[in-house]
Amino acid sequence: MEKRIITISREFGSGGRTIGKLVAEHLGSRCYDAELIQKLAAESGFDENYVKEAGEYTPGGFLASAFTDRSFGPTNEDLLWKLQYRIIRELAEKEPCVIVGRCADFILQDRTDCLKVFVHADMKFRADRIVRVYGEREKSPEARLKEKDKRRAAYYRFYTDMKWGDAANYHVALDSGVIGIEKCAKVIESLA
């Protein structure tokens, strides 16, 4: 079956966002990444920066895993999750597209027309890339990578009860440090 929807989960600095944009451009479809954050912000009334950051934090922060009782009601993060879930489902119904991050692989797991991709790379490739592409100036880009990936993994586990980056959750996993950004895009396009 033809894959109308492509979801790209990625390690920070692996080039997943760039790969998603290339795939969408080559397939003539839309890529939802920053656009998805803008849509979530517009519909929720929250600031874009808050929405962006909320996608990497579990509700309640560090102690959330110890205190999962929601007797005080849903958190802002929970409300954003529900809205994000609905918007991603609507986008997938509306048109062929590439969706980067935001647990889209989980949200669309029941769709047979969805190709789920995970992009990763070794620490050196990613550290070099965030310094070169994003101008990262921290003393230890490796520490930043570990922190971002840890947050993404915790968010993913919290809302999906699945392990982020586990190959069993995706149709294909690509090492952008070995294969290269452009070739990763071509591989995905060939599978769509």
Label for each model-derived stretch:
Residues 41-96:
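ATP-dependent small-molecule kinase phosphotransfer cores
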Residues 2-11, 95:
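Pre-Walker A (Motif I) flank of P-loop NTPase domains
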Residues 8-24:
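Glycine-rich phosphate-binding P-loop
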Residues 91, 104-110:
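RNA pseudouridine synthases
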Residues 30-42:
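Short beta-strand-centered segment that lines the nucleotide-binding/catalytic pocket of NTP-utilizing
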Residues 110-133, 138-148:
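Conserved phosphate-donor/acceptor-positioning beta-strand/loop module used by diverse small-molecule
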Residues 59-66, 78, 137-181:
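Small-molecule kinase domains that catalyze NTP-dependent phosphoryl transfer to phosphate-bearing small molecules
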